[in-house]
Curated annotation (Swiss-Prot):
The lineage of its organism: Bacteria, Pseudomonadati, Thermodesulfobacteriota, Desulfovibrionia, Desulfovibrionales. It comes from the Bacteria. It is a multi-pass membrane protein. PANTHER family: POTASSIUM-TRANSPORTING ATPASE A CHAIN, POTASSIUM-TRANSPORTING ATPASE POTASSIUM-BINDING SUBUNIT. Pfam families: KdpA. Belongs to the KdpA family. NCBIfam families: kdpA. This is Potassium-transporting ATPase potassium-binding subunit. It comes from Solidesulfovibrio magneticus (strain ATCC 700980 / DSM 13731 / RS-1) (Desulfovibrio magneticus).
Length: 582
């Protein structure tokens, strides 16, 4: 990796960490019901929403009711989006007169957006109407992100409270996440994107003159036979309320693009400045929630330890991705091609560094938006983002889900440390006993099972024409797909055709299970911890805010998360990389 790339990485991380600190403190005040700067503006609206919906925000819930209410809201969201997709052909705000969405794709999309995955088995600009994009997909971008934040806050309360069954009120946590955090940040980011040229309009499309006076003229079959193909007189450019959807798709670590090529499209991400702003938006809330955790638990050092582990892991994987994409393809050596970094599948306005750093950020978080085609990365350049997903989306991770995922790994870390010293493990003053260990094991083991079992199933019975490349890279496409869907990321090796019934239904099942079969054990863990006494730290207690704990946590994440996938990675990207040197 050259020094310029290193400077970019360090600058990005510095800005991210500086911005995350005040946001994390602000979020802690929001969730603790303390006065904050937005109270005068949003307080009356919050109370009005409670009155209209009949919610008693002062009534707290135990973990079972919290989980039941959360599941009910998300189930309703899935059904609503599915119906909206199927009926969009007869609904307003459809200037391109797009028909209803295929039922298999509609199911996949409804589950995808409700689970914060945003896997897209469709081309946004040619499949979804403006109404579907706004009322269906954008609304789920807010609600799915707020759901993850609410669950994370419930787990924090479980660690902070003592001898109680109450974890808070889901409706209040959801509402405050949207009103006080997601909406203001999205509004500011959308304005910045509009300033940089991202459209925000209800106009369906516009026609424009070609810059090239004679584009796309087909070549003649023979020099003596002139071509009869005529270039179109105008080019058609699809528009829509793009800026508002891009803002929440990044801030909520959703990732679903308004256009088919996502943030590689010049109307979603037109300049290097928007590229930086959107990358910061992807990781901002996940990083900030670490500070929120420290404040709410009463020991800011605990949050800093979690943030340090996340940042060290991200910096390492980002550096590896940058290094892999900064070297020329070995197969081009010796044939007169200049030894320059590969720009295949990348936008020139972002270059290799901007594309590789985005790839690391979008897969570290459960975001999945792309500004370059990961399928065109070098074998190792594509493997490191894939491995970031396979770690369980805990390296910053999704909004809320990244924090509660890393806290689960922290529980496993103190359990392992307790085994080594022969005493009952503790975390934040709470004893970690068999029930907590079982819930943590469920959360950690389900995503790898979904990834590996889904890939095996696709290799055996999946449609053969879905894979565009034979050999190791074709296997990598399938492994990447289920690693993405099984960890609620949503990015893809785009050479995979994922519109068949097998891929849409299998993907929907993987996304559903990896979201809710993890959230329920996390809430059960929170409920169990909330009922425990908080113990004073003794001489044999492992400090969970120091460098030793951070190092142990990183090792546990790498050993438990990464080693699970070594055999599969050996069949895919590693084999492909070795083949380049033959």
């Amino acid at each position: 990796m050259n020094p310029i790339n290193l400077v970019q990485l360090l600058f990005f991380l510095s800005v991210l960490l500086v911005l995350s600190w005040p946001l994390g403190l602000y979020a802690a005040r929001v969730y603790q019901g303390q006065p904050c700067v937005m109270d005068k503006i949003l307080g009356p609206l919050e109370r009005l929403l409670y009155r209209i919906s009949g919610v008693d925000a002062s009534r707290e819930m135990d973990w079972k009711i919290y989980a039941l209410v959360m599941l009910g809201l998300n189930a309703f969201g899935m059904v609503f989006v599915y119906v909206l997709e199927r009926l969009q052909g007869g609904l307003p705000l459809n200037p391109l007169h797009l028909p209803g969405v295929d039922p298999f794709v509609a199911v996949n999309t409804a589950v995808s957006f409700a689970t914060n995955t945003n896997w897209q088995a469709y081309a946004g600009e040619s499949t979804m109407s403006i109404l579907t994009q706004m009322l269906g997909l954008a609304v789920q971008n807010f609600l799915s992100a707020a759901t993850g934040m609410a669950v994370a806050v419930a787990l924090i309360r479980g660690l902070a409270r003592r001898e109680t069954t109450h974890l808070g009120n889901f409706w209040q946590d959801l509402t405050r996440s949207v009103l006080y955090i997601l909406l203001p940040l999205s509004f500011v980011l959308a304005l910045l994107l509009v300033w940089q040229g991202v459209p925000q309009t209800f106009t369906g499309q516009v026609e424009a003159d070609w810059l090239d006076p004679a584009p796309h003229v087909a070549e003649s079959i023979s020099p003596d036979t002139p071509s009869t193909d005529q270039p179109p007189a105008k080019q058609t450019i699809v528009l829509g309320p793009v800026a508002s959807q891009v803002a929440i798709k990044q801030l909520g670590t959703n990732g679903g693009g308004y256009f088919n090529v996502n943030s590689a499209h010049p109307l979603e991400n037109p300049t290097p400045l928007t590229n930086l702003l959107e990358m910061l938006a992807i990781l901002l809330i996940p990083a900030a929630l670490c500070h929120t955790f420290g404040v709410m638990i009463g020991d800011r050092r605990q949050g800093l330890a979690i943030l340090a582990a996340m940042t060290i892991l991200f910096a390492g994987f980002a550096a590896l991705t940058l290094a892999a994409e900064s070297v020329p393809n070995p197969t081009l050596s010796g044939i007169g091609v200049p030894a320059v970094p590969s720009l295949e599948g990348k936008e020139v306005r972002f270059g290799t560094a901007g594309s590789a750093l985005w790839a690391a950020a979008t897969t570290a978080a459960s975001n999945g938006s792309v500004n370059a085609m990961h399928d065109s990365f070098s074998p190792l350049g594509g493997m490191w983002p894939m491995l970031l997903m396979q770690l369980g989306e805990v390296v910053y991770g999704g909004v809320g889900s990244g924090l509660y995922g890393m806290l689960v790994f922290a529980v496993v870390t103190v359990f392992v440390a307790g085994l080594m010293v022969g005493r009952t493990p503790e975390y934040c003053g709470k004893k970690i006993e068999p029930f907590e260990t079982k819930m943590a094991a469920l959360v950690i083991l389900i995503p790898p099972f979904l990834c590996l079992a889904g890939t095996a199933l696709a290799a055996v019975i999946g449609p053969a024409d879905a894979v565009s490349n034979p050999g190791p890279h074709g296997f990598s496409q399938m492994l990447y797909a289920f690693s993405s869907m099984g960890n609620n990321n949503g990015s893809a090796f785009a050479g995979l055709t994922a519109t068949s019934p097998f891929w849409t239904i299998a993907g929907a099942v993987a996304m559903f299970v990896s979201r809710y079969w993890l959230i329920v054990p996390v809430l059960a863990l929170a409920g169990s911890l909330a009922g425990k006494k908080r113990l004073a730290q003794g001489p044999g207690t492992l400090p969970t805010h120091g460098g030793i704990f951070v190092a142990l946590l990183i090792i546990v994440v790498l050993v438990v998360g990464a080693l699970t996938f070594v055999p599969a990675l050996a069949l895919g990207p590693i084999a492909e990389q070795l083949a380049l040197f033959q």
